[in-house]
Amino acid sequence: FAKTAKFVACGFDRLDRLPLAAEDRKKVVGNPVRSPIKAVRDKPYPELSDTGPLNILVTGGSQGARLFGEVIPQAIASLPEAQRARLTVVQQAREEQLEAVRAAYRAAGVKHTVDSFFSDMQDRLAAAHLVIARSGAGTVTELAVAGRPAILIPLGIAMDDHQTANAEGMVTGAAADVVPEPKFTAEMLAPLLLERISNAGVLKARAKAAWQLGNPNAARDLADLAEQAAGVTGKRDA
């Protein structure tokens, strides 16, 4: 189909298996995002210093919450006490893990909100200084549009390792770190996390880099491209 399509719209610059003959018709338009996420883009990155309060948002979805519930509390518990005292962690966890994850944070003296679902995710994202997440296309797109730095853990069983490909732009754009799932342990995460939360300047720079990668108008751009392909002219509601 790509060989005969007038345009090939894609969410990210990397598009594997695209026929060479269609390469010059590839158009990177991004992925549409919900209005509440676009609204986060217009809000400033939360105030942050090297020693002040820092908010971490952990979202894993059904394919990531179990691993995150095991590794992340353990990694955070191993941080120096002064760093743990700064943190507020908002974490999505599986229902059967909720009490264990909460208990781990209580024992570590870390302020936390742990639940299996958050209906106000846009508000949680707006308050976050750093996000730890999988790298599904929707998640990566929302992080970029919102302008939030991240530590991304691609789903190991994802077909063709497409979650690593999704994260590529955030990594090359200096907006995120990527940790392969087999290497995602508390012993590996703790020093990386400590390095990130100890330097407010780096997190702010990464937030700006993520923001610059985001396209809040992907839905409009895709519609424009469809109309162009169809030869439609004239005004259309935004």
Which residues fall in each region the model found?
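Short hydrophobic beta-strand element within catalytic cores of glycosyltransferases
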Residues: 133, 149-160
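Active-site-proximal region of nucleotide-activated glycan assembly enzymes
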Residues: 1-42
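Short alpha-helical segment that forms part of, or immediately flanks, the ligand-binding pocket
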Residues: 122, 140-148, 168
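Donor-nucleotide binding loops and adjacent catalytic segments primarily
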Residues: 42-131, 164-168, 172, 179-189
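C-terminal alpha-helical cap of glycosyltransferases
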Residues: 215-238
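Short loop/helix-cap segments at secondary-structure boundaries that form the rim of catalytic
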Residues: 1-2, 15-23, 99-107, 124-125, ...
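Acidic donor-binding loop of glycosyltransferase active sites
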Residues: 126-140, 148-149
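A short, well-ordered alpha-helix in the C-terminal region of glycosyltransferases
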Residues: 202-216
